[in-house]
């Protein structure tokens, strides 16, 4: 539990459901976990979640630059790319598995960047992890910029 250094790492705020400031987080939240990628994904899945590696193409901390490939058999529903690359280019350049959906998010680190890149899903039924996973598996999604 190292203390955060706001002067070099930036502030870490805790907000409530309405987005209102609650407090500053004093502990540094940038430290890595002592899990392998496979262990992490397995735990997320076991808890009913859905692991989607984020901005896999980004030079800093992206899955492809860090590992050089997507591990075969990694039980994820999708791979997320940054707004800097087209899905078709990412698929070809990084030899992404055909069975995995490639989605895009805004990778927002600032409030005004939220929604700058969007993947729309065609869901059947209620909003749930299972229905999102099914839509991704059945390729019922579209990347919007």
Spans of model-derived segments:
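Divalent metal-binding segments
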Residues: 21-33
